[in-house]
Amino acid sequence: MIDFGNFYSLIAKNHLSHWLETLPAQIANWQREQQHGLFKQWSNAVEFLPEIKPYRLDLLHSVTAESEEPLSAGQIKRIETLMRNLMPWRKGPFSLYGVNIDTEWRSDWKWDRVMPHLSDLTGRTILDVGCGSGYHMWRMIGAGAHLAVGIDPTQLFLCQFEAVRKLLGNDQRAHLLPLGIEQLPALKAFDTVFSMGVLYHRRSPLEHLWQLKDQLVNEGELVLETLVIDGDENTVLVPGDRYAQMRNVYFIPSALALKNWLKKCGFVDIRIADVSVTTTEEQRRTEWMVTESLADFLDPHDPGKTVEGYPAPKRAVLIARKP
């Protein structure tokens, strides 16, 4: 059973304490009524993982944990088998006591693009919206963050996060809650808010930007990463039924249009930090994610287009400040 009590105790003593007015009831409702049919199977995999205290832990350059003495072949096999019970692994990679989880996405590449443009994360309280398995939260902790809170309603991601946390010595500096941004009150409590790979899934992208702003302290920093297309400040793609085989893609703006959207929502000091084409080296099928990936979503005769004929995925990172 995944227990959120440690998180409640933690925030009871800091500037997130007002969240306790609503959060425990939301989590109790989720536990009672909304759990996935496979959740018990996934949470059992977490429970059966060994308790290990890492001798060497690197969260600055990767997410790597090592023991003082090498684990036995049987111990490694146990960890690998239990972690494979939590497939598919989409965001990573993780290197845990000789078990190398080669995830669909090289999320470390995204972090390397984003990190140089961030304000110093040392001592910051961070919210990561749509955090997936929590890979980037661990990198935030490695960069000096005091606390990283992730929200993502996908329950497999929660179990993946808890599995990694257990193998990192039950590290309590990062926490994942099975909630969507729309379930959060306007906390106005986070120094930095990340939204990476979420905006294009929202039916109302400006509402999403307002929701992100409501989580920031004054002078707080927003880090927004999303799909974009080429064009001027008036260019926005509204795909038909699917984009790169994804059904739930609603709006893909140009980076300049996105900058205007942020301005309209009251953000300042808005800058386009990076624009990069997503490659089949960064997103691909692996032993830990065996179904279709980016190569299957692109036109086989023109990799500059999706199978639907739209421009192939390109992603931008924008940084902005809440005044």
UniProtKB/Swiss-Prot annotation:
Residues that, per the record, bind carboxy-S-adenosyl-L-methionine: K91, W105, K110, G130, D152, P153, T154, I181, E182, M196, Y200, R315
Catalyzed reactions: carboxy-S-adenosyl-L-methionine + 5-hydroxyuridine(34) in tRNA = 5-carboxymethoxyuridine(34) in tRNA + S-adenosyl-L-homocysteine + H(+)
Enzyme class: transferase
Pfam family membership, one: Methyltransf_9
Entry keyword annotation includes rRNA processing: no
Gene3D superfamilies registered for this protein in UniProt: Vaccinia Virus protein VP39 (3.40.50.150)
Keywords: Transferase, tRNA processing
EC number: 2.5.1.-
Swiss-Prot/TrEMBL GO biological process terms: tRNA wobble uridine modification
Family matches, as InterPro entries: CmoB, Mo5U34_MeTrfas-like, SAM-dependent_MTases_sf
Gene Ontology MF terms in the entry: methyltransferase activity; transferase activity, transferring alkyl or aryl (other than methyl) groups
Domain of life: Bacteria
Cited function: Catalyzes carboxymethyl transfer from carboxy-S-adenosyl-L-methionine (Cx-SAM) to 5-hydroxyuridine (ho5U) to form 5-carboxymethoxyuridine (cmo5U) at position 34 in tRNAs.
Family note: Belongs to the class I-like SAM-binding methyltransferase superfamily. CmoB family.
Subunit: Homotetramer.
Protein name: tRNA U34 carboxymethyltransferase
Gene assigned in the entry: cmoB
